[in-house]
Structures are given as structure tokens and as C-alpha cells.
Swiss-Prot record:
Cofactor(s), by name: [4Fe-4S] cluster
Catalytic activity: indole-3-pyruvate + 2 oxidized [2Fe-2S]-[ferredoxin] + CoA = (indol-3-yl)acetyl-CoA + 2 reduced [2Fe-2S]-[ferredoxin] + CO2 + H(+)
Molecular function, one GO term: 4 iron, 4 sulfur cluster binding
Alphabetized CDD domains for the sequence: TPP_IOR_alpha, TPP_PYR_PFOR_IOR-alpha_like
Function: Catalyzes the ferredoxin-dependent oxidative decarboxylation of arylpyruvates.
Designated gene of the protein: iorA
Name under which the protein is recorded: Indolepyruvate oxidoreductase subunit IorA
Record's keyword annotation contains GTP-binding: no
Residues that, per the record, bind [4Fe-4S] cluster 2: C585, C602, C605, C608
Organism (species): Archaeoglobus fulgidus (strain ATCC 49558 / DSM 4304 / JCM 9628 / NBRC 100126 / VC-16)
Keywords: 4Fe-4S, Electron transport, Iron, Iron-sulfur, Metal-binding, Oxidoreductase, Transport
Length: 623
């Protein structure tokens, strides 16, 4: 809870979400600058600090912003660190791909003020397009990676990483993941330091801060020396420890897998030695070697990639059981059952329960339940946009429909079927550039407003420059919807509850050189279809901005004012099924005999009334 995050009660125990605990750790560390681009499962860190910076104003002041993308967020934090201030940037795992360019260079430069990058990985891809393991970024960029094993450690290690960053002059990577970020646990609070936000004078350090080749050649050996020093620290750090046990079979458990391992051993009634690892890079070589050398067999438990397992195998000191020889799952996130099954298999015993049977039975039960696929919300303007796009595509006979990352990716589902390709943020525009030069078909790409600002502008400039012929529909719902309605530069709002200057998307588009630019409310289906037809006839890239606030925010505002007028299906309905079969708003219900509108779901967008060929849908009442 937010009140607990900002509570100045040292020693008190509270119940926090993992992401709230990370935010609290940053507060206890006396953070000066925070920057983020929202992305599940990291978003609540930024949201919590956005509220906290307002509530703590005058007691523990810091600057917080939602940045245009992850690269910008990382660079904002870099600037603060180089000025001697403590800074944190947070993002989901694929966001680090966007920030990778400055990440690798900043490793050479080094941190002055404490610098912490939080990457929230997503094993099992609950809300992501891949399952990448960002521990590899630490190895590739030669930066330390720390991985908490509990919500308490999430708070403690977030705070500790600032100290380590300043002690060793290194940017620190704190690796979270879905089951830590979105878990709740008891956290003992530390003290919130009292401080004012103060500006400082710039001090020049061109020999380290300007990574010319001549400087970089000198900086790399220094970076490697820093890594050696922090490895020595990790070898004796309290974040890693050995739980003594019986026998010559040991387990190395990484991060949250430690909790799964301890419960699995309890279920199996075993007392095996366990090395709990939270320093993922550089790995504590001496600590691992001392542990492994005492064992005949070592079971490695870690999520996503065999990162630690590869290292332990290379030592050649014991038989290793893990992902690479099929004892631990190579795919998806772990739980107690998966870990216990792997340990039992390595030991040649049976697990305490038939976990595979339990999973099979649960799948049978799930198959009997009514399907509940994710859908666009009632009144979502994206539904109206995709309906209009589908109308135009049906007139054409076919078209290529690249899309992007956001709520609107759900446009892939029937009956809208408005999404053919989704790769990454901004790729709808970039991919359309490529398709435009090789396809006979027309191309209609879709991208959200926040995603367009994040990564859609450079490929749009490329389309103008290289004369790529396609239509780009910017689905502008005036928020970053899928991650929790965070502000972006187009909204006029900023972090910490402050107002900002709204950047008009149509001005950006025209500034890129696009000649066909039209703004339309997608609830006006007839006009939306007309604009799309004209855009398709334009020679070159054409941009249609479909602007209507997110239905959730729009309906909340109108409910507060008592202005919602819902709609109902009248006796004039002929069961033509146009509304159900081609629009499919969740508020529309067909029970096998008649079509009706769920009054508790309807937000009064009136799109169903506009597309009904028999004018059988009318206003019902004011709520």
C-alpha cells in the first residue's frame, strides 16, 4: 500500500508488493532522480514513486519522470549519476533492449552518484513477446547483476545497490521478475532520510565521460578491475549464503528459486546443502567453488536460461543436473512443483505429489470452463477503429495489417482481425516500410499514441524519406493504457502529479514531412471509413490519428458527472447480427434468441447504434 511505502517508521513491518518494496528501497537510499518507461511487470515501481514524490515533498525530495522511452529514461539517470546524484531507471526486460546502447557505453564511463537499473523479466511471458534473461546483459556489458529472492530482499537490495554503485564506481543491475514484482510480502522498513533536492555545479571529466576510442581503450581495463573487486565483495557478501545439510548432493538456487527449493525440500523431507545465490554477475567464483568441490552432484535451480549452470559445468568439479540435461525445465517460470519434480528426478526418487497429474487434471477442468479470452473493453475506441479498418479491408479484398505493442494488439481476435504482425515497440511503422517496397497489397498499420512517441517517429521519417506507401493509423487514446494509464508526452501530464506541456502528435507527424494527416474520432464510424479510403488513395505515407480517450478513463469521468447514457436493443432488431458478428463489443450479448446490451457494461459510446443497419439500438437511460 502507498501509505506504507512512504511511512517513516523504522523497524515497523508492513505488507508490500515486490515493486513497492523496490520503490521503498530507492526512497530509503535517498534517491535524487528516477526515470522510467512503464512496462509490465515493472510499472508499479514508477507509479509508486510518482505518488511518493508528491507525498514526501518537503521531507525527502526527489525528481521523478515518465520518460518517452527506456533509452531516454536510462540516459536521464546517467546524467544525474554523472553529476553525483543517486539515480534509478526502471523498465521491463525488453525495455533494456531499447536502452542497450547507452548501457554498454556507460559501463565504461562508470557511475559517480549511485546508479541502479531495474530490469523486470517476465518468465512464462505473461505480458511480453519473449522470455529473455537479462542476466546476460550484465555479462555482456560487464556490469554487476543482483537478484533478490524475496520481497524483503527486493527492498534491501534496491537500497544496497546504490551503496555498491558508489563504492565500486559501477552501474548496478537489479533483476526482478513477474513473481517477485507482483508478489506481496512482509517488509521491515528502514529509515527515510530527510533531504532537500539541491542542484550542484557541473564538474568536467572528459577523460572518462567522453568515450572516444582513445579513452575507451584505457577505460576497459579499469572496468575489468572494478568487476574483480566487486566479485571479491560478492564472495563474502551476506546476500549469498550456504544452508548446511546432509550428504554430498547440493543445490545452487538463484533468486526466487531459493524459496521454491526450500519448500520442495521440505515436501521431500530432505535436508540437502543449499547455496543461495543473489549475485548473478560476476558470480562469486570462490564461494561456488568451495561449495561444489564438496559435492558429487550439484542441482542448479534458476529461471529462464542456464546462466549459472553453464558456469558450474565449466568448473568440472561435480556432476551437474539442471536445464541442459533435462532435469529442470528449459521453458517458462518455476514453481514449487516444477522444482520439486526436477530435484526428485535428479535424485532418482518420486516427488511428494503427482504434480504432472495435478496439472493434467487442472487442464481438464479448465477446458470445461467457459473461455474467457482477453478482449478490448466495452466502448474501447480501438474497437471502433478496427471495425472501420475491417470495413475498408473487406472493400479492398485484402491488405497487410502490421500492428504494435499495446491494448490494441487484441485487435488480432475475431471478428475484427485487424492485426497481422506484432514484433516490438514501433515495429508496425518500420515493418510497413519494408512491406511497402515488396507487396502488391495495400498496407494499414496501427500503433498507439504512447508507442508512437516511444519508437514510431524514426521509422515514420524513414517512410517519408524513402517514399514508402502505406497508411499509419495512430490509435490515440490519450494515455499509456495497457500498463495502467500512465501519462506520456502527448497527455499534458507528468510524473509526481505535475502538469506538463502536451506534445501534439499531429504536429510531430507534419514535422516529419507527412503530407496526408487527418484527425478523426473513431466513434464516428462513417467519417473514419471515409478518411481511411482517402488515405489509401494518397501517394506515399498517410497518417490517420484516431483520437478518443480510453473508454475506462472516459466513462469514469462521465460517471462522476452523471452524464452516461447507455444504449439498448429495441424490438426493431431483426437479428441480422451485424453488431455481434462484426463489432463484438463485450456489452453486446446474444443468448441464442435475442441480442441485448448489458447495462452495467455499456459506456454509451453509441458505435453499435451507428453500425446497426436497422437502427434498432437506441439510448436507454441516464446513469
Amino acid at each position: 500500500m502507498l501509505n506504507d511505502v512512504v511511512r517513516d517508521a523504522e523497524g515497523e513491518k508492513v505488507f508490500l508488493l515486490g515493486n513497492e518494496a523496490i520503490a521503498r528501497g530507492a526512497i530509503e537510499a535517498g534517491i535524487d532522480v528516477f526515470a522510467a518507461y512503464p512496462g509490465t511487470p515493472s510499472s508499479e515501481i514508477a507509479d509508486t514513486l510518482s505518488d511518493a514524490c508528491r507525498l514526501l515533498r518537503g521531507k525527502m525530495d526527489f525528481y521523478m519522470e515518465y520518460s518517452a522511452n527506456e533509452k531516454v529514461a536510462f540516459e536521464v539517470a546517467v546524467g544525474a549519476s554523472l553529476a553525483g546524484k543517486r539515480a534509478m531507471a526502471t523498465m521491463k526486460h525488453v525495455g533494456v533492449n531499447v536502452a542497450a546502447d547507452p548501457l554498454f557505453s556507460f559501463a565504461y564511463v562508470g557511475a559517480r552518484g549511485g546508479f541502479v537499473l531495474v530490469t523486470a523479466d517476465d518468465p512464462s511471458m505473461h505480458s511480453s513477446q519473449n522470455e529473455q534473461d537479462n542476466r546476460w546483459y550484465g555479462k555482456a556489458a560487464k556490469l554487476p547483476v543482483v537478484e533478490p529472492s524475496s520481497v524483503q530482499e527486493a527492498k534491501d537490495y534496491a537500497k544496497l545497490c546504490f551503496d555498491l554503485s558508489e563504492k565500486f564506481g559501477l552501474p548496478m543491475i537489479l533483476r526482478s521478475y513477474t513473481r517477485l514484482s507482483h508478489a506481496s510480502g512482509v517488509v521491515e522498513l528502514g529509515k527515510i532520510p530527510e533531504k532537500e533536492f539541491s542542484r550542484v555545479e557541473w564538474e568536467r571529466h572528459p577523460e572518462t565521460d567522453v568515450v572516444l576510442p582513445a579513452h575507451a581503450r584505457k577505460l576497459k581495463p579499469i572496468l575489468l578491475e572494478k568487476l574483480e573487486k566487486i566479485e571479491r565483495y560478492f564472495n563474502s557478501s551476506e546476500m549469498n549464503w550456504v544452508d548446511e545439510g546432509d550428504g554430498d548432493v547440493g543445490i545452487i538456487a538463484c533468486g526466487l528459486s531459493y524459496a521454491y527449493t526450500k519448500e520442495a525440500l521440505e515436501n521431500l523431507n530432505l535436508n540437502l546443502p543449499v547455496l543461495k545465490l543473489s549475485s548473478m554477475h560476476p558470480l562469486p567464483e570462490r564461494l561456488i567453488e568451495n561449495f561444489v568441490s564438496q559435492m558429487k552432484k550439484v542441482i542448479v535451480v534458476e529461471e529462464v536460461d542456464p546462466f549459472v549452470e553453464l558456469h558450474v559445468r565449466a568448473m568440472g568439479l561435480a556432476e551437474v543436473y539442471g536445464k541442459m540435461n533435462g532435469y529442470m525445465p528449459m521453458n517458462y517460470e518455476y514453481n514449487v512443483g516444477r522444482v520439486e519434480t526436477g530435484i526428485a528426478k535428479a535424485l532418482g526418487i518420486k516427488p511428494s505429489r503427482d504434480y504432472e497429474g495435478i496439472v493434467a487434471e487442472s487442464q481438464k477442468l479448465a477446458a470445461k470452463a467457459p473461455p474467457r479470452p482477453p478482449v478490448l473493453c466495452p466502448g474501447c475506441p480501438h474497437s471502433a477503429s478496427f471495425y472501420a479498418i475491417r470495413r475498408v479491408v473487406d472493400e479492398l479484398g485484402d491488405a497487410a495489417l502490421p500492428s504494435d505493442i499495446g491494448c490494441y494488439t487484441l485487435g488480432i481476435n475475431k471478428p475484427l482481425e485487424g492485426v497481422d504482425i506484432t514484433i516490438c515497440m514501433g515495429a508496425s511503422v518500420g515493418v510497413s516500410n519494408g512491406l511497402a517496397h515488396v507487396l502488391n497489397n495495400k498496407i494499414i498499420a496501427t500503433i498507439g499514441d504512447s508507442t508512437f512517441i516511444h519508437a514510431g517517429i524514426p521509422p515514420l521519417i524513414n517512410a517519408v524519406y524513402n517514399h514508402a506507401d502505406f497508411v499509419l493509423v495512430i490509435l490515440d487514446n490519450s494515455t499509456t493504457g495497457m500498463t495502467g494509464h500512465q501519462p506520456h508526452p502527448g497527455t499534458g501530464f507528468r510524473g509526481c502529479g505535475e502538469a506538463g506541456k502536451a506534445v501534439r502528435i499531429e504536429d510531430i507527424v507534419r514535422g516529419c514531412g507527412v503530407e496526408f494527416v487527418e484527425v478523426v474520432n473513431p466513434y464516428n464510424v462513417r467519417k473514419m471509413v471515409d478518411v481511411l479510403r482517402r488515405a489509401l488513395n494518397h501517394d506515399g505515407v498517410a497518417v490517420v490519428i484516431a483520437r478518443q480517450p480510453c473508454a475506462i478513463l472516459w466513462s469514469r469521468a462521465r460517471r462522476r458527472e452523471g452524464k452516461i447514457v447507455t444504449y439498448k436493443v429495441t424490438e426493431d432488431c431483426t437479428l441480422c447480427m451485424e453488431c455481434v458478428n462484426t463489432f463484438a463489443c463485450p456489452a453486446l450479448i446474444f443468448d441464442g434468441e435475442k441480442v441485448s446490451i448489458d447495462q452495467s457494461l455499456c459506456v454509451g459510446c453509441a458505435v453499435c447504434a451507428k453500425i446497426c443497419p436497422n437502427r434498432a439500438i437506441k439510448p436507454a437511460k441516464s446513469n
